[in-house]
Amino acid sequence: MTLRTTALATDSWPAFTTHSADDVIVAALSISRLVDWCGTPCVHTADAATPGSGGRLSETELASVLAARVVSARWSGDLRLHVVIDAELDGCRPVVEEARHVGRASTAAAAAVVLESGRTRAAGYAAFLPGDIAAGDLVVIPCLVVIPCLGVTLLHDVKP
């Protein structure tokens, strides 16, 4: 989905998450800048939003945002765009219907995609992303649990 035309589902993202035409910002931290610092895949963990609150801060729960780089994107005979990313989605309860393309604004129509991991042979996840997504692009996916992954750069907001 292009960032310009779709609103974030606030219950799926950490509290205080906003977006621009080419970025997702979690608690004032640009995910695009985070990737510049940490590389991909990387995870930002912050306070979760309280379900049904419209994005208000949870006092007890955490949520993660996974940033991954597109390794390849190809149209398949099943009429879907198969997008391979450099991250593993299994185990993090990804909200793939909220996946966002960041790093550059896209005006391409949303296309049905299958997000696949370049690390395992696990089955893909159905999502919608811009039809012009290509190798090198960034995808950001909210996850409903904290991601305790090995080999992934983690950044966590710490409460004062």
Regions found by a protein language model. Give the residues of each.
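Conserved alpha/beta-domain cores
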Residues: 2-64
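Charged (often Lys/Glu-rich) extended helix/loop segments that serve as interaction or gating elements
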Residues: 30, 55-160
